[in-house]
């Protein structure tokens, strides 16, 4: 078994002498091994894991290594010592060391600028093939060192996932290494971003050979030498094509151009970049070293953009730069009027070029040849003195006149797109003066200034264009929007992507001041030069719909429509409840559990919704409380969103004015409380007569009581809705008969539902329906108590006879007699308690003193028992431990109940006397 240390370890001591952790990747490469773009420590650790990892172990990549071992290994690598991972480390520590190296990089393997594009791409894509192409292109934008390291890591993890798929899937490995590659913190707030990163990383692992190893589709290279070779080849081809073009473009009057003119893909972009870099490198102000990285970046992007556009129309990073490119005015020479184009089929109409990368995705009009921006290098060199004072550029528009190729039925020709620009001036191409804008696509009158010259390439003759009269191009309404008839439209439609209709939007004239502001077309939003307008907002594409299509409404009837724009609190409550419900459903789908209050509080947006919902509910409750005087104000129906705001506004206002007068009249005619009470009593009496209910409550059955209770409840609610709940003493006195009757009915209904207990001394009392205690009146219980005493004596004799007969059957006469005596004593105690209510004050005081003395005696006995139990067992006595003194506890409870009864009776008889 060979050691995991690399054979080149002894030769890399000079590399390891410097610090490894926390050092950028480009510095590590420049430090000692420029040929090997993967850091040595990564290769060393990965080789060790592949040989001695035991990757079939469950949870190997999720187990953290020993912190002390990882720190010791880091110090060894930083100090330049030779490390033998087989003898000095274990697999979890090696994996933790690898992840620690990735985490300590100053810039992640996926830089922040590219990280944003990847996140946006992952959220916006709809097609898997398109997502794969764009992701592959974005990966090629990585620096060479980062690309090599990412490729090496993905190859290692893809091998692990393929050989141990049951244990380590691509998703699980992506969840472990994704945050390390992208530098994503695993906090709760970044859970969504972490999921996106894990999904991207899993896609890289599952489709590793498609993204990294497929040489047929890997058109661009990260090597500067290969880029230079490609640029040189393209520049040589361009020179040959240019010579042929100059020969065929010599001006001859009355001569028609040949139909066999070669169609050449123009890559003058790269040629001008090389020329501009060579010119700039000779300057004394800027050193060639500072230019090299920028030129390299532009070269890379240029090659990739041209190849991607030619092969599969993929949007590149130059798209962002071209969107900021503002076109200057179209210029022509004074010789333009002297040269005329022959042939009726030639159509010389100028249009500003659309984005070169998104040409296949936008609508192109075949009737207008595509113009291209020419930032001529020779013109730049001539005007360099003026550029130091004024930050301007000379822009030439390279125009190709369209001529008949012999086929008059084909109204459109295939055209080439030219884009020549200076790389050093790319960031300065911003239009400073709006007076130079010449809008030729909006079908308006336009003047072409003749004082400026057209920039040419080399010493070739400039093809002058005659002055175009565009005044009568769209005067008639019979003109229709032209649509492409060439192959590129068909190819785009066959690519599987959704295409806009060629007649998607009717072009409109420039709006007048008094007209309503229309919506800009999508094509005019990209480069800001020509403003196109659409008639119908329903025909806008997705990006144009982002603009608000608003129209200034006239206040047809009155200015009170603004008040109706506000949503009612009920609508806002429903909207917030819907948002919160959607959050809860999403949370439950993700975590299989309903969100708790802490989960809601952790999300500031949802917490804000909850706070607003609470405020709105409180507002609605306050509004209901304000309207509780008796008038139920009808809620205004919310206005339909589909109807115009002025629809029916005058009618609504007239209705409101008419409704105000009846409200005032109703308030003036509101009946008094006494009249309302009389009306309620009259209605109750009529209902009792209709349902044949007795007037006396005592004669009512249980069903009658239920009906009476419901009627009283409705009556009381009606009274409270008219006058509110009675609060003051006068208000309660007025409605007191109604409330007393309701309480009595409720009490009798409750008593009627209780089943009486047979054999109990208080059976008669429980079965009887108690009269309500009326405030300020003395309640008389003497007759009931006497009846209970007589019943108690009879009951005791009956119980005695029954017990005697039962004891005779059991042949235990003595025990039966003792039981009878005990029962009689208990009954006597109950009788004394009942008779104490009719006793005088001295008798009550005497019973009170005796009860207190007996209570004191029992409490002393129980306390002694509890203390002895505590000393014996070391704990307090529980309920099951009180069996020896159970009778004392029962007596103690009875004495306490008797004391409470005596104190109440004494306080009722004479509350002024102190006990």
From Swiss-Prot:
The keyword Thylakoid does not apply. SUPFAM superfamilies: GTPase activation domain, GAP. Residues 23-212 form the Rho-GAP domain. Gene3D superfamilies: Rho GTPase activation protein. Residues 661-671 have a biased composition (Basic and acidic residues). PROSITE patterns: RHOGAP (PS50238). GO terms for molecular function: GTPase activator activity. Residues 637-649 have a biased composition (Polar residues). GO terms for biological process: regulation of small GTPase mediated signal transduction; signal transduction. Residues 487-521, 621-671 are annotated as: Disordered. Keywords: GTPase activation. GO terms for cellular component: cytosol. Belongs to the FAM13 family. This is Protein FAM13B.
């Amino acid at each position: 078994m060979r050691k995991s240390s690399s054979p080149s370890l002894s030769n890399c001591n000079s590399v390891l002498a410097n610090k490894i952790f926390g050092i950028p990747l480009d510095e590590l490469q420049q430090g000692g091994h420029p040929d090997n773009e993967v850091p040595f420590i990564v290769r060393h650790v990965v080789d060790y894991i592949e040989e001695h990892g035991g990757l079939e172990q469950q949870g190997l990549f999720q187990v953290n290594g020993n912190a002390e071992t990882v720190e010791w290994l880091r110090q060894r690598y930083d100090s330049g010592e030779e490390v033998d991972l087989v003898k000095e480390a274990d697999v979890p520590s090696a994996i933790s060391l690898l992840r620690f190296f990735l985490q300590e990089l100053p810039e992640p393997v996926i830089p922040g600028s590219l990280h944003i594009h990847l996140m946006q791409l992952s959220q916006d894509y709809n097609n898997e093939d398109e997502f794969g192409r764009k992701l592959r292109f974005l990966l090629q934008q990585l620096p060479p060192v980062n690309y090599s390291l990412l490729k090496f890591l993905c190859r290692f993890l893809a091998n692990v996932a393929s050989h141990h798929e049951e244990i380590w899937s691509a998703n699980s490995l992506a969840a472990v290494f994704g945050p390390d590659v992208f530098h994503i913190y695993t906090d709760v707030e970044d859970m969504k971003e972490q999921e996106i990163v894990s999904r991207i990383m899993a896609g890289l692992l599952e489709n590793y050979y498609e993204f990294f190893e497929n040489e047929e589709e890997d058109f661009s290279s990260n090597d500067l030498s290969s880029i230079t070779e490609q640029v040189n080849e393209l520049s040589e081809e361009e020179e040959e094509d240019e010579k042929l073009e100059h020969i065929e473009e010599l001006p001859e009057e009355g001569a028609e151009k040949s139909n066999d003119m070669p169609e050449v893909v123009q890559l003058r972009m790269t040629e001008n970049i090389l020329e501009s870099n060579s010119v700039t490198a000779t300057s004394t102000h800027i050193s060639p070293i500072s230019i090299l990285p920028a030129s390299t970046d532009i070269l890379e992007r240029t090659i990739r953009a041209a190849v991607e556009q030619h092969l599969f129309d993929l949007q590149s990073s130059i798209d962002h730069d071209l969107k900021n490119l503002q076109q200057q005015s179209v210029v022509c020479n004074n010789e333009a009027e002297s040269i005329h184009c022959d042939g009726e089929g030639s159509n010389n109409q100028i249009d500003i070029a659309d984005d070169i990368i998104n040409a296949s995705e936008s609508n192109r009009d075949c009737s207008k040849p595509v113009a291209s921006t020419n930032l001529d290098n020779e013109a730049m060199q001539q005007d360099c003195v003026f550029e130091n004072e004024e930050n301007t550029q000379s822009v030439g528009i390279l125009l190709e006149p369209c001529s008949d190729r012999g086929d008059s039925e084909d109204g459109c020709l295939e055209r080439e797109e030219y884009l020549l620009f200076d790389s050093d001036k790319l960031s300065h191409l911003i239009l400073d003066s709006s007076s130079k804008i010449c809008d030729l696509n909006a079908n308006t009158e336009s003047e072409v200034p003749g004082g400026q010259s057209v920039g040419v390439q080399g010493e070739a003759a400039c093809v002058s264009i005659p002055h175009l009269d565009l005044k009568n191009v769209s005067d008639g309404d019979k003109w229709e929007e032209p649509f492409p008839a060439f192959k590129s439209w068909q190819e785009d439609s066959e690519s599987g992507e959704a295409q806009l209709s060629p007649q998607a939007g009717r072009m409109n004239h420039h709006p007048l001041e008094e007209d309503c502001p229309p919506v800009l077309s999508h094509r005019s939003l990209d480069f800001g030069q020509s403003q196109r307008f659409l008639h119908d907002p329903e025909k806008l594409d997705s990006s144009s719909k982002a603009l608000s299509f608003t129209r200034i409404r006239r206040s047809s009837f009155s200015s009170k429509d603004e008040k109706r724009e506000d949503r009612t609190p009920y609508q806002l409550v429903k909207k917030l409840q819907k948002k919160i419900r959607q959050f809860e459903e999403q949370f439950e789908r993700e975590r299989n559990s309903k969100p708790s209050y802490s989960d809601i509080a952790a999300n500031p947006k949802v917490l804000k919704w909850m706070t607003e919902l609470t405020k709105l509910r409180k507002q609605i409750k306050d509004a209901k409380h304000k309207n509780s005087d008796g008038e139920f104000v009808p809620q205004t129906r919310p206005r339909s969103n589909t109807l115009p705001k002025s629809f029916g506004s005058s009618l609504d206002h007239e209705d409101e004015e008419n409704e105000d007068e009846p409200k005032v009249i109703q308030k003036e005619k509101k009946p008094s409380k006494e009249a309302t009470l009389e009306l309620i009593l009259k209605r109750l009496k009529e209902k009792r007569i209709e349902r044949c209910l007795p007037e006396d409550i005592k004669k009512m059955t249980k069903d009658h009581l239920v009906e009476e209770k419901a009627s009283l409840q409705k009556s009381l609610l009606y009274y409270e809705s008219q006058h509110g709940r009675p609060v003051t003493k006068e208000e309660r006195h007025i409605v007191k008969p109604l409330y007393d009757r309701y309480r009595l009915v409720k009490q009798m209904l409750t008593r009627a539902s209780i089943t009486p207990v047979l054999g109990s001394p208080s059976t008669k009392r429980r079965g009887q329906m108690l009269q309500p205690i009326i405030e300020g009146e003395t309640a008389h219980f003497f007759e009931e108590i006497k009846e209970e005493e007589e019943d108690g004596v009879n009951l005791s004799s009956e119980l005695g006879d029954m017990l005697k007969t039962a004891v005779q059957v059991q042949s235990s006469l003595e025990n039966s007699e003792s039981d009878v005596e005990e029962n009689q004593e208990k009954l006597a105690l109950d009788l004394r308690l009942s008779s104490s209510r009719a006793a005088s004050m001295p008798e009550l005081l005497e019973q009170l003193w005796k009860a207190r003395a007996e209570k004191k005696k029992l409490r002393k006995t129980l306390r002694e028992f509890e203390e002895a139990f505590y000393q014996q067992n070391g704990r307090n006595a529980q309920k099951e431990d009180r069996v020896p003194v159970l009778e004392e506890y029962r007596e103690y409870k009875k004495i306490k109940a008797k004391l409470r009864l005596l104190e109440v009776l004494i306080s009722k008889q004479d509350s002024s006397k102190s006990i």
